[in-house]
Swiss-Prot record:
InterPro entries: Globular_prot_asu/bsu (IPR011070), Prot-tyrosine_phosphatase-like (IPR029021), Protein-Tyr_Phosphatase (IPR050348), PTP_cat (IPR000242), SptP_N (IPR015203), SptP_N_sf (IPR044899), Tyr_Pase_AS (IPR016130), Tyr_Pase_cat (IPR003595). It holds the Pfam family Y_phosphatase. The tyrosine phosphatase activity is inhibited by sodium vanadate. It catalyses: O-phospho-L-tyrosyl-[protein] + H2O = L-tyrosyl-[protein] + phosphate. Its EC number is 3.1.3.48. This is Secreted effector protein SptP. Changing T213A: Loss of RAC1 binding and GAP activity. Residues 315-543 form the Tyrosine-protein phosphatase domain. One of its GO terms (molecular function) is GTPase activator activity. The keyword Hydrolase applies. The gene is sptP. It comes from Salmonella typhimurium (strain LT2 / SGSC1412 / ATCC 700720). Forms a complex with SicP. Binds host RAC1. Changing C481S: Loss of phosphatase activity. The record marks R209 as: Arginine finger.
């Protein structure tokens, strides 16, 4: 539901910005006659005087002038957003986006009737297919051209692919407004409405078409890389027959699939779209912060889609190293690296929901993990009511498991080993499981010898070579405790030491934090035990 203030502004049409008898170069702003009406008006004389005083060194730092300058900035931003909204209502988001991208008009200037006409002419040209003409294969020589308005004529000029600074904020504003409008519509969609209204939803200003158009804006702004990476992950998720990014176009394979899909298939597709739409609200929140003056985010946790046990505010997930399934679905797991080489997969204890456990099992199966290492103690599993998913037989969605206990290892029977058979469709895989039952949270193992012994067991379970020799996220050990930062980081670091006892532990910790989050190897006592293990290994090597 739009706020009352937004509804008033959105009622302003393009004709509202054409003022008879007003100079074409007069600055325009949105005035309020009373609480029920907003209208476009030329700048008042008193405002012009204060603006002029702001250019004088003697007056520009006075409180009244500084306050006026800030008010002008807010007014200019508001009227530009309102004007672009009016343009979008008439010509559509695609035309407005293309015009902003290709135009060399300075959007940082105050809006005047002259500027409004120039922008409108650009949008008209885009709406009539001029941008498509420039980009077409028959016009290779002008594919990097830009629209330039001079003397009322539309011309073509050479331009690189970078978006000008003056266009970035308008593009972000359009993206924000589009997300606010389309996400609630997608969340209310069901299978029946998807089948009945797909053509309308995937064309024009329909929510699916509009969503994809607005998300593309982020790809045009280099500084928005974190947001764009987040969006790309979500739009690469398979929904039905195709990646979600393909759902904004009608007349293709998605439309044919929607027309023939079963009720169950449509229900599953809508369920995924709902989850994606909910996740995209994080992008909306970031854009709102930027609109309020915050800088572009330099880091951003990857999307969790409800699969993570802990909120990313507690256990962040580096989206650059986040593991993804073959259907594009991201899971709350990272690839830990040291010196640029993968060491292990690391995550929290799987969330006790069918979707989370299914995704976890699919990951073990698809990535053909060399082994699964569960560092959560038996006492903690019982206290936290954590699902013992790695022993026994279960069905998690499409994945079936059958785990048989092989042995209780030495070290005081503190380590149980299982062989867990996984099957999903025609794919089968058996993964060794090591469950360490006596490692308390935030504490070291009872002895350094046990840590070294455990590292040997993990390495011996790895039939694909020592950790760190893989060049991808496949064939690596999957390690988790409860949160996936302390014991998990310690175990992975121990594997690095077994591979090379001379490794710099401080650098290992730094690389793990870059790989996953700043909490990796956060417990001092566990780090001390790693140093003790390193000393033992170096002594053995020396002798």
């Amino acid at each position: 539901m739009l706020k009352y203030e937004e509804r008033k502004l959105n009622n302003l049409t393009l004709s509202s910005f054409s003022k008879v008898g007003v100079s074409n170069d007069a600055r325009l702003y949105i005035a309020k006659e009373n609480t029920d009406k907003a209208y476009v008006a030329p700048e008042k004389f008193s405002s012009k005087v204060l603006t002029w005083l702001g250019k004088m060194p003697l007056f520009k730092n006075t409180e009244v002038v500084q306050k006026h300058t800030e008010n002008i900035r807010v007014q200019d931003q508001k009227i530009l957003q309102t004007f672009l909204h009016a343009l979008t209502e008439k010509y559509g988001e695609t035309a407005v986006n293309d015009a902003l991208l290709m135009s060399r008009i300075n959007m940082n200037k105050p809006l005047t009737q002259r500027l409004a006409v120039q922008i409108t002419e650009c949008v008209k040209a885009a709406d009539e297919g001029f941008i498509n003409l420039i980009k077409s294969k028959d016009n290779v020589g002008v594919r990097n051209a830009a629209l330039v308005i001079k003397g009322g004529d539309t011309k073509v000029a050479e331009k690189n692919n970078d978006v000008g600074a003056e266009s970035k904020q308008p593009l972000l504003d359009i993206a924000l407004k589009g997300l606010k409008r389309t996400l609630p519509q997608l969340e209310q969609m069901d299978g029946n409405s998807l089948r009945e209204n797909f053509q309308e939803m995937a064309s024009g200003n329909g929510p699916l078409r509009s969503l994809m158009t607005n998300l593309q804006n982020l790809n045009k702004i280099p500084e928005a890389k974190q947001l764009n990476d987040y969006v790309t992950t979500l739009t690469n998720i398979q929904v039905g027959v195709a990646r979600f990014s393909q759902w904004g176009t009608c007349g293709g394979e998605v439309e044919r699939w929607v027309d023939k899909a079963s009720t169950h298939e449509l229900t599953q597709a809508v369920k995924k779209i709902h989850v994606i739409a909910k996740e995209l609200k994080n992008v909306t929140a970031e854009l709102e912060k930027i609109e309020a003056g915050a800088p572009m985010p330099q880091t951003m946790s990857g999307p969790t889609l409800g699969l993570a046990r802990f909120a990313v505010s507690s256990i962040p997930i580096n989206q650059q190293t986040q593991v993804k399934l073959s259907d594009g679905m991201p899971v709350p797991v990272n690839t830990l690296t040291f010196d640029g080489k993968p060491v292990a997969l690391a995550g929290s204890y799987p969330k006790n929901t069918p979707d989370a456990l299914e995704a976890h099992m699919k990951m073990l199966l698809e990535k053909e993990c060399s082994c699964l290492v569960v560092l959560t103690s038996e006492d903690q599993m019982q206290a936290k009511q954590l699902p013992p998913y790695f022993r026994g037989s279960y069905t998690f969605g499409e994945v079936h498991t059958n785990s048989q206990k092989v042995s209780s290892a030495s070290q005081g029977e503190a380590i149980d080993q299982y062989n867990m058979q996984l099957s999903c469709g025609e794919k089968r895989y058996t993964i060794p499981v090591l469950h360490v039952k006596n490692w308390p949270d935030h504490q070291p193992l009872p002895s350094t010898d046990q840590l070294e012994y455990l590292a040997d067991r993990v390495k011996n379970s790895n039939q694909n070579g020592a950790p760190g020799r893989s060049s991808s996220d496949k064939h690596l050990p999957m390690i988790h405790c409860l949160g996936g930062v302390g014991r998990t980081g310690t175990m992975a670091a121990a594997l690095v030491l077994k591979d090379n006892p001379h490794s710099n532990l401080e650098q290992v910790r730094a690389d793990f934090r870059d790989s996953r989050n700043n909490r990796m190897l956060e417990d001092a006592s566990q780090f001390v035990q790693l140093k003790a293990m390193q000393a033992q290994l170096l002594m053995t090597t020396a002798s």
